[in-house]
Amino acid sequence: MGYTTYFDGSLKFNKPVEDWLVEYINKFNTTRRMKRDNAKIKELFPDWEKLCFSGNLGEEGEYFIGGLGYYGQGNDGSVLDHNCPAKTQPGLWCQWIIGGDNDELMWDGGEKFYDYVEWLEYMIANFFDPLGYVLNGDITWEGEESDDVGVIHVEDNVVDVEYGVHVHSMSAMDTDAMIKELEKRGYKVTA
């Protein structure tokens, strides 16, 4: 069970992302973000410096992309809480990846992506901005509930969210039907 949200669009980087960062971010995407003990990571994973962001584990192993088991979900000795992310992270899974020609940030297409705006802000603050990468563009979302729609707008790494009507989803409606739908969603429409 859970709640699925669909995304359309991508954010463009100001320059192609270096291969090492693409590899890191896309591995970050495929590992469960669990609260960990940094000392235990260093003890259990001798190559830990290759399994984190620029040799930095961050707080509670937030930058660690190693681990045991499927998608790094195994309960090795470094895991403090399997169902709780590091205190600096918004959730257990980050589903933003770098794609295109290493010049776009986009949804990975997976289901049940929660805290997507918070994850985007986290990635900008922790990975992209410090390395001089700047994102711009729009990504629309549409959740399972009819009123769960909107646009994530990013301009020069500043994230703005517009909740409400996703006009694209109503493009096939005639004017009267669109007005009725908007009023049903609580909007007051005047001509």
Can you say where each PLM-predicted feature lies in the sequence?
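Short, low-complexity, charged amphipathic interaction modules
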Residues: 171-191
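Acidic (Asp/Glu-rich) sequence patches and key acidic residues
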Residues: 1-172
